[in-house]
Amino acid sequence: MLNADYGEGDNLSANAGRFSEIITGYDKNGNIEGLKRSGKSSSTTYGMIDNLTLTYDGNQLKNVTDAATDPLYNGVFNFVDENKGSGTEYLYDSNGNMQQDYNKKISKIQYTLLYLPTTLQFTNGNRKDYTYSADGRKLKVVHKTAIANISVPMGQIKELAASQVSQTHTVDYCGNVIYENGSLNKVLTEEGYATLSGTTPTFYYYLKDHQGNNRIVVRLNGTSWNTEQVNHYYPFGGVFEVNTETSGKQPYKYNGKELDRMHGLDWYDYGARMMDAALGRWHVVDPLAEKYYSISPYVYCGNNPVR
């Protein structure tokens, strides 16, 4: 992919370019070298929210710089150049798994033998702990939010005392049944999901596009339908700021995958590994990399996300 031009109306001339995404270059292995993204820059204006330059050490991401001004609009899906440095911002282990991210302030990620994250630690004390079955199915995630003024050095993981945790959010995955903080949250179905209030179920249904992206979520209300969520996407899965949501957060979005936005992570969980939609790449080597010698093992879907 090179250009994804946004427009509305029959000839796409209305609001042209509001949510366009342009790839300005690739290296010989297919790694993205430049990316420009437009979006909502304030509550009333639109413009460029990302102007990224990516540099590599082989196929491993080394540094990302952003020449655009970060948007003022709250909740914008964009790349945040927190480090604003020219040195190495991403560090990897000997198996090619990203361990440190200076822009997301990830001090360290620990992995299982299947290269799935078990602990993801942020420098401000926030962390995520994952539990899997023996075959790699995700069973549980514990999101911990630290109190203010906690500092974790890069390369380290810190066990917080109970008094240092301001909030804990636990999600259990029991097949198609999802529990949050010990209470039943939803039951996933082929068409969407159901929630329970007492013994009364409420059914929600997805309207998908040709890629399996959940575009609209509707709720069955007696004999009528209520629109609960509308999603629009950038080519690599970033979400538009004009998306609407009326009944709490429904995280299954691009390709029907779960988007984790807590603590600013903004990664999609594809099961075998997680995808960074802001950069259009994985941070873990493709388990089937030996079948695709001609392209980087970190590239997402051969750089053709809309086919």
Where are these regions (language model features)?
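Primarily recognizes Gram-negative and organellar outer-membrane beta-barrels
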Residues: 5-12, 25, 38, 95, ...
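Short turn/helix-capping motifs enriched in Asx and small/polar residues
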Residues: 222-239, 263, 271-273, 277-307
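Acidic glycine-/aspartate-rich tracts in secreted/extracellular proteins
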Residues: 6, 38-40, 68, 144-148, ...
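A short glycine-rich beta-turn/N-cap micro-motif
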Residues: 1-11, 20-35, 55-63, 76-77, ...
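A motif-centric feature for acidic-aromatic and gly/ser/thr-rich catalytic loops and repeats
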Residues: 179-185, 190, 195-271
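Extracellular/periplasmic ectodomains of large secreted or surface enzymes and adhesion receptors
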Residues: 48-92
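A residue-level detector for well-ordered beta-strand positions
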Residues: 23-24, 52-54, 90, 109, ...
